[in-house]
Swiss-Prot record:
It is found in: Nucleus. The gene is dpb2. It comes from the Eukaryota. In eukaryotes there are five DNA polymerases: alpha, beta, gamma, delta, and epsilon which are responsible for different reactions of DNA synthesis. GO terms for molecular function: DNA binding. Heterotetramer. Consists of four subunits: pol2, dpb2, dpb3 and dpb4. Interacts with dpb3. Keywords: DNA replication, DNA-binding, Nucleus. Belongs to the DNA polymerase epsilon subunit B family. The keyword Nucleus applies. It comes from Schizosaccharomyces pombe (strain 972 / ATCC 24843). InterPro entries: DNA_pol_a/d/e_bsu, POLE2. This is DNA polymerase epsilon subunit B. The keyword Manganese does not apply. GO terms for cellular component: chromatin; cytosol; DNA replication preinitiation complex; epsilon DNA polymerase complex; nuclear replication fork; nucleus.
Length: 594
């Protein structure tokens, strides 16, 4: 396979007089420009593209034009971000200044493919592997505030790139847009589920096992009938529970409700099965979370849209999936609640660092999650203490030159880290200001101060890291229903360890089913409205760190997404951390005595 690719690089397209007809190019151009990049092409611009493809690809245009058109579309999106219509006057300079001709494009792919298929790559030493991974295509950390913002177009049922840049001081309409986006993402996901797809031929075919959603506005005049609704749980000022969708709302009677597996609180999007009463109430029989959709199914539904702004197409991702098999032993070490104002923290950290310093294979990266102070950071009086904590950490790290040289350190802020207002921080949260960590940067060769949440891209794997004490927030705000689910024993009769595992599974299922890291109303969990998309869990990540210091360590696999939490570093007389292997989706929890 390598020889054929090399040949295609060395042999340039034949420079013969060949003309591609616009009508012949139209299907490919439509697929690339319209379906993939949401751009519209008029007749003149299609003619210009056909002429350009004729010159670059010649008689081999059918097999070679798609990568070329992809590069042109990417360049257009970068240069004319707010112009969705590709016009000929603007297209001509784009084609003239295109710096990535087709043969170079193939060469870059060939290089990746050669890396992944040759034995020298698969059998290379650790040092050679790290040198290769330095390329940003293989490893990068995505900041929540630098991700592209996509809006959901409900009429076309597609995501489109927002023309307006998000701001910290968003208008009131941003709150409405935020809720609409959450609703439509989950609603479209439900409709793709086979249980909600009505057979094309009804007649003699049984429809057992399929469900149909009813808009709330359609309940009027249909008292006494049973319906399945979908909407947002809200609490009215008088304390009553309501269900809202995009058009209407209805008050719920949950006195006889049987809840499904998971946690339910105001702000959650739920499926409700029940009967509409003549009094205007909706008597709930069952209440549950939307069905989950696996990552590959979501990516297929999005037509492999580059929703994270990685600038990699499906072919490149396929090559990376093959290449990453050589890195199954590469580990991410995750440590949480690293209080730098506690001397025992440094004792535990040095024990962990020494373990890896003396081993042959050091971790690929070490993720240190806050809070980095045991009390909330205040604008007055905390700055000196906060910086001294990181200076002490830098002094401690100097004892371990091997990991400082070869391991990447990622710092994720927690609830007590700057900046907070009366101990409350908005989500997403900016990275730790560099003023406090300049000594860390001098000691460690590779340091990344990430936002909260952040996404770590490792080859084709997406590892989502979110630091929040979310389990306690769910416990404080969860709703109580009239009936206990069938088959559920008295909670007091279950051992404490099993209760914790049960709650952890509920937590993971709820977050992934909701496709959002913070399914709470703004009064419960304040959010920057214009950046709410950064908290979305759609499509599912390859792996997710739900870092919660109030919960014990766990490792839960659900929907094809391994979810982990190392718990607090210090817990009683033990210190805890986890090793995550993103390629083989394996998680190892460590617990050792101080």
């Amino acid at each position: 396979m390598n020889n054929s690719i090399t040949d295609s690089v060395e042999k340039k397209p034949e420079q013969v007089s060949f003309e591609v007809q616009p009508n012949a190019l139209r299907p490919v151009a439509f697929h690339v420009f319209t379906r993939k990049y949401d751009l519209n092409i008029n007749r003149d611009s299609l003619q210009e593209l056909a002429s350009f493809v004729s010159k670059k690809c010649g008689s081999q245009w059918r097999s070679q034009c798609e990568p070329l058109l992809d590069e042109i579309a990417k360049t257009w999106k970068r240069v004319h971000e707010t112009q969705p219509i590709v016009t000929r006057p603007l297209l001509i300079p784009v084609l003239a200044n295109l710096n990535v001709p087709h043969e170079v494009r193939v060469s870059s792919l060939a290089r990746v493919q050669t890396l992944e298929t040759t034995g020298s790559f698969l059998n290379s030493s650790n040092s050679e592997i790290r040198e290769t991974i330095k390329n940003e295509k293989y490893f990068r950390v995505l900041d929540a505030f630098k991700m592209p913002k996509f809006k959901y177009d409900s009429s076309r049922k597609v995501f489109v790139l927002s023309k307006q840049s998000p701001t910290l001081m968003a208008s009131a309409s941003a709150c409405t847009d935020m809720l609409n986006r959450r609703f439509n993402v989950v609603y479209s996901r439900i409709l793709r589920n086979e249980s909600f797809q009505t057979p094309s031929f009804s007649g003699s075919f049984s429809q057992t096992g399929t469900y149909q959603l009813t808009p709330i506005r359609n309940l009027l005049g249909r008292a006494g009938n049973t319906f399945l609704l979908f909407g947002l749980l809200t609490i009215a000022p008088d304390g009553t529970l309501w269900l809202e969708d995009l058009d209407s709302q209805v008050q719920l009677d949950v006195s006889q409700a049987e809840q499904g597996f998971g946690l339910f609180c105001p702000g959650c999007l739920v499926l409700v099965n029940g009967q509409f009463l003549s009094s205007g109430l909706f008597l709930v029989f069952e209440l549950g979370h939307p069905p989950i959709e696996r990552r590959d199914a979501s990516l297929k539904a999005l037509n492999n849209l580059d929703i994270l702004g990685l600038n990699m197409d499906a072919k490149q991702l396929a090559l990376l999936r093959h290449a990453e098999q050589a890195y199954q032993s590469q580990a991410f070490v995750c440590i949480s609640e690293v209080h730098l104002d506690n001397h025992q923290t440094f004792y535990a950290l040095e024990k962990i660092f020494q373990k890896y310093e003396s081993s042959e294979a050091v971790p690929f990266c070490i993720i240190l999650c806050g809070s980095f102070m045991s009390s909330a950071f205040h604008n007055s009086g905390s700055s000196i203490q906060y910086k001294e904590g990181f200076n002490k950490l830098a002094a401690s790290l100097e004892k371990f030159p091997k990991i400082c040289e070869k391991t990447k350190f990622i710092f994720v802020p927690g609830p007590n880290d700057p900046w907070t207002t009366n101990g409350i921080s908005l989500m997403p949260k900016h990275s730790i200001p560099l003023h406090f960590v300049n000594r860390i940067q001098r000691v460690c060769k590779h340091t990344i101060f990430a936002s909260n949440p952040c996404r770590i891209i490792f080859f084709s794997q997406e590892v989502l890291i979110y630091r929040d004490d979310i389990s306690g927030r769910f416990q404080r705000n969860s709703l109580k229903f009239g009936k206990t689910p069938q088959g559920t024993s008295n909670i007091n009769s279950i051992p404490l360890a099993e209760q914790q595992v049960h709650q952890q599974r509920k937590l993971v299922k709820t977050v992934l089913d909701q496709s959002h890291l913070s399914p709470f109303p703004s009064r419960t969990r304040p959010i920057l409205w214009d950046f709410d998309y950064a908290l979305s869990v759609f499509p599912l990540p390859s792996c997710m760190g739900l870092i919660d210091s109030e919960s014990s360590a766990f490792d839960v696999h659900y929907g094809g997404c391994p979810t982990f939490n190392p718990g607090a570093l210090l817990l009683g007389v033990h210190y805890n951390w986890q090793e995550v292997f993103p390629v083989k989706k394996e998680i190892i929890t460590h617990k050792e005595r101080i």
